[in-house]
């Protein structure tokens, strides 16, 4: 992705170790700063040189002061890498450099204020940039915001995340401009994590509760707490398997919010499930034949109950959806062929598809401020909804684009395609 302008230097062995080679040395020890003396030794070793070659000094310039051209070339390359955002000096230390945070993650993150077309189709657009900037002054009305913001993990994933102290403000700063533009029929579906713990403790974070209050203060009404039960691995390992203080986590909450409950557009008839064989047999038999009363008469069965044919069964607010799916496999394969990092949060297509069917109709606008693999955008595309996705990692924009390549009107920003190539 990064490009570096060549610098005019005296010919020598230094031409054998350019920006890519120097970067590779730092990447081999991504969490450790490297002093220049050690760097010179590693460069010599990788280039198959005797260290004396880097120590050789020759007269330079009118003054004739003697310098090592090879060491100078390496230092110039360090400066090029600094300007490209790959390396940075260790504060207060002379001649010691390290990878920047972005370089350690292997991602090209959008600078503040950047808003650039990533790719588009006839129905939607993916924008490279921070969503806190992308969705300000939006001139269209989102019918539903369907998203999974970064979780406030103690050990961030490659794409980074705010801390527990920062997460509520981070989410609200991004969502508030969208909430303001949302019509009264609009909704917000927010996939969060209950697997977040206080530092060094088995006690869980209450960031979900704090965010719930913040969203209510912003004028939204909580309509449901959907449980997404997946086949995620057992955890948390430390507190469930080692100290044995907690149970294994099996689900993530999805909070459903309405701008105005009376005009909420969610409709369970769009997500009806097939009746079970047992229930179909009950309908065919004309319904219940019993007369039963439960709970002091609060629940009663009468002859004929459940005998009326219906289009399907209303889903319960527990979604059982595995993490892997065909589109996820397609995304991973494309990213690997392009040499791109794979987004670590694997929300399946089926979760986004269910939420979009439930909360919107064809032609409605769906927005996802944290696109990741772009599954929300893809589900909106397949369901004939318009969509806008924001993503601050250029690599994730490029990888997600491959899911849309066969969609009508697909266009990938040529600069992005040239930077990362095309899947053959």
Label each residue range with its predicted role.
Residues 128-133, 416-422:
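Conserved SAM/SAH-binding loop
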Residues 113-121, 382, 401-416:
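Short, conserved SAM-binding/catalytic segment
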Residues 102-127:
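Short, amphipathic alpha-helical interaction segments positioned at domain boundaries
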Residues 38, 48-77, 83-88, 95, ...:
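Core catalytic lobe of class I
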Residues 3-37:
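Positively charged, polyanion-binding regions of nucleic-acid-associated proteins
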């Amino acid at each position: 992705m990064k490009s570096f302008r060549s610098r005019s230097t005296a010919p020598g062995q230094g031409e054998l170790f350019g920006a890519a080679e120097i970067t590779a040395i730092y990447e081999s020890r991504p969490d450790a700063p490297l002093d220049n003396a050690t760097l010179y030794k590693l460069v010599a070793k990788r280039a198959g040189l005797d260290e004396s070659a880097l120590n050789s000094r020759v007269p330079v310039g009118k003054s004739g002061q003697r310098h090592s051209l090879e060491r100078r070339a390496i230092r110039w390359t360090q400066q090029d890498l600094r300007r490209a955002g790959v390396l940075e000096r260790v504060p207060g230390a002379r001649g010691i450099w390290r990878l920047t945070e972005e370089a350690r993650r292997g991602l090209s993150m959008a600078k503040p204020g950047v808003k650039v077309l990533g790719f588009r189709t006839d129905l939607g657009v993916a924008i490279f940039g921070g969503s806190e900037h992308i969705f300000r002054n939006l001139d269209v009305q989102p019918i539903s915001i369907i998203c999974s913001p970064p979780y406030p993990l103690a050990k961030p994933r490659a794409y980074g995340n705010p801390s527990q102290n920062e997460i509520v403000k981070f989410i609200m700063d991004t969502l508030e401009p969208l909430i303001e533009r949302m019509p009264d029929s609009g909704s917000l579906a927010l996939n969060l994590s209950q697997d977040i713990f206080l530092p060094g403790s088995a006690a869980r974070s209450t960031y979900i509760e704090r965010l719930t209050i913040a969203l209510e203060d912003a004028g939204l009404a909580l309509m449901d707490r959907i449980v997404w039960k997946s086949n995620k691995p057992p955890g948390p390992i430390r507190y469930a398997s080692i100290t044995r203080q907690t149970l294994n986590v099996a689900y993530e909450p999805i909070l459903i919010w309405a701008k105005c409950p009376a005009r909420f557009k969610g409709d369970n008839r769009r997500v009806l499930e097939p009746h079970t064989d047992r229930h179909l047999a009950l309908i065919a038999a004309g319904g219940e034949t019993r007369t039963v009363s439960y709970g002091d008469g609060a629940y009663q069965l009468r002859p004929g109950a459940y005998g009326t044919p219906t289009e399907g069964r209303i889903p319960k607010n527990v979604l059982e959806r595995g993490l892997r799916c065909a589109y996820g496999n397609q995304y991973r394969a494309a990213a690997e062929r392009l040499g791109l990092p794979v987004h670590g949060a694997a929300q399946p297509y089926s979760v986004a598809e269910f939420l979009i069917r439930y909360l919107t109709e064809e032609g409605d606008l769906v927005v996802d401020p944290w696109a990741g693999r772009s599954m929300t955008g893809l589900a909106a595309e397949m369901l004939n909804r318009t969509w806008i996705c924001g993503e601050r990692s250029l690599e994730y924009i490029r990888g997600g684009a491959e899911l849309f390549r066969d969609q009508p009107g697909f266009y990938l920003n040529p600069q992005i395609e040239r930077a990362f190539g095309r899947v053959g």
